[in-house]
Amino acid sequence: MTRLTLALDAMGGDFGPCVTVPASLQALASNLQLHLLLVGNPDTLSPLLAKADPVLLERLQVVPAESVIAGDAKPSQAIRASRGSSMRIALELTKNGDAQGCVSAGNTGALMGLAKMLIKPLDGIERPALMTVIPNQLGGKTVVLDLGANVECDSTMLVQFAVMGAVMAEEVVGIAQPRVALLNIGEEETKGLDNIREAAAVLKNTPAINYIGYLEGNDLLTGKTDVLVCDGFVGNVTLKTMEGVVRVFLSLLKSSGDGGKQAWWLKLLGRWLQKRVVKRFGHLNPDQYNGACLLGLRSTVIKSHGAANPHAFAVAIEQAVQAVQRQVPDRIAARLEAVLPKSD
């Protein structure tokens, strides 16, 4: 059995250790080869671990950290004051080889900046991108990036994202010759900002990329493409809007039929139908695919939603496990070398 070690920023996110500790124990229970370095304040973490299964604790080590980077801190200020923080120490453990990957629900900008500074981007990559894999209505999966790491992107960055996304779809998701599209306000070639049109022109002439053109936001879940590329501002708004709609939809399904005066048999029928529909669409629940990979780095770094619950954070940990096991950074580096020019 091969040991796999991850470093977790236990203090990051909206709920900190109240989420990360139970999620860690859940992840350890479901994966016997997993070892975790829980980075945070020992005085805060110890009480939450006191009643944990001693067998699980044999594969968990608390690494002390003096501080935590606030979720609303400006990235530049957070990075300057990051020494001794749980996020930075978790990344340093990954950089030094004590861990094979890092998971944090903390400040996205700070995580991006620190990861770029400590872990370093792959050759040929200007800036890493946040990527996730979401389910689509055809029963397949769609790789989407960037989801917020880079608010503004030039055409070169969009092309790099397209290459990384295609590699991810082919090497990890298992899609042969994945289709790649750019997210735009229309499918016509004349639509969109200059950077999008310039990226489209490059991708059309890149034989290694199966570029299919522009898609609009309403195609996010249709399965028309295997990789959808956009800048971080658009990607973040698009994904969170979709997640919000899905959460409301599932919530309405679960609550429908609970009130009002109905015959008993109608209530039973309603609940039966309700369970079937919730089960049918449950895979769209954002908690089931929490965890965005900071793609383009030399090691695995996963960003969890700040508001993740324990189950969702455990999913992010599993995302990191899969990325490490499938050697995502190495596979991307090998493919990038053949497609993109190396940076000076």
Swiss-Prot record:
Family recorded in the similarity comment: Belongs to the PlsX family.
UniProt protein name: Phosphate acyltransferase
Subunit field text: Homodimer. Probably interacts with PlsY.
Cross-referenced Gene3D superfamilies: Isopropylmalate Dehydrogenase
Coiled coil start-end: none
Enzyme class: transferase
Listed GO MF terms: phosphate:acyl-[acyl carrier protein] acyltransferase activity
Keyword Mitochondrion in annotation: no
EC numbers for this chain: 2.3.1.274
Role according to the record: Catalyzes the reversible formation of acyl-phosphate (acyl-PO(4)) from acyl-[acyl-carrier-protein] (acyl-ACP). This enzyme utilizes acyl-ACP as fatty acyl donor, but not acyl-CoA.
GO biological process, one term: phospholipid biosynthetic process
Record keywords, A-Z: Cytoplasm, Lipid biosynthesis, Lipid metabolism, Phospholipid biosynthesis, Phospholipid metabolism, Transferase
Catalytic activity: a fatty acyl-[ACP] + phosphate = an acyl phosphate + holo-[ACP]
Domain of life assignment: Bacteria
Organism in which the protein naturally occurs: Serratia proteamaculans (strain 568)
CC terms in the record's Gene Ontology section: cytoplasm
Annotated disulfide bonds: none
